[in-house]
Amino acid sequence: MATYTTSDFKPGLKFMQDGEPCVIVENEFVKPGKGQAFTRTRIRKLISGKVLDVNFKSGTSVEAADVMDLNLTYSYKDDAFWYFMHPETFEQYSADAKAVGDAEKWLLDQADCIVTLWNGAPITVTPPNFVELEIVDTDPGLKGDTAGTGGKPATLSTGAVVKVPLFVQIGEVIRVDTRSGEYVSRVK
């Protein structure tokens, strides 16, 4: 099995920790004035979703995680599962609610997603970075009503709620950044 040392660490690197695949969210090399150098990392366990801060002594080796990231197309959802299809082989994968997580509110039919597989089963679903959704409910923006933070909540066609500028109305299509859940722009 492949291994990584602390010099290989970078955000996005996947490795095994306590028998569970993890991904490095952020890392920092620390060389104190006295003592051994170490790498301070923030990792997210891919199955449980827990975020941990872990320090590794310089030169420590970790086992590479045997995970695959596949570009799949979201097909449909039934009572308990979301179904994704490989665009070339037409192979179907089913992901449960735990694997889909917060990505559910950004999934549109035929959207290209990155699905992470471990032992052949989906463990995480990453939606596209930007999605275009229609606003189905929001307060009307009154002219001259700029005394607040300059935003209002809007419910989108998938059920997600995002903060939008006052000029955006019901029925308009907006672009949303799925990583932060923030409004980006109106779609012409």
Curated annotation (Swiss-Prot):
Gene Ontology biological process terms from the UniProt entry: peptide biosynthetic process
Domain of life: Bacteria
GO molecular function terms attached to this record: translation elongation factor activity
Location of the protein in the cell: Cytoplasm
Coiled coil residues, start to end: none
PTM description: Is beta-lysylated on the epsilon-amino group of Lys-34 by the combined action of EpmA and EpmB, and then hydroxylated on the C5 position of the same residue by EpmC. Lysylation is critical for the stimulatory effect of EF-P on peptide-bond formation. The lysylation moiety would extend toward the peptidyltransferase center and stabilize the terminal 3-CCA end of the tRNA. The hydroxylation of the C5 position on Lys-34 would allow additional potential stabilizing hydrogen-bond interactions with the P-tRNA.
The keyword DNA repair belongs to this UniProt entry's keyword annotation: no
Task of the protein: Involved in peptide bond synthesis. Alleviates ribosome stalling that occurs when 3 or more consecutive Pro residues or the sequence PPG is present in a protein, possibly by augmenting the peptidyl transferase activity of the ribosome. Modification of Lys-34 is required for alleviation.
Classification via HAMAP family: EF_P
Protein known as: Elongation factor P
Source organism of the structure: Haemophilus influenzae (strain ATCC 51907 / DSM 11121 / KW20 / Rd)
Gene: efp
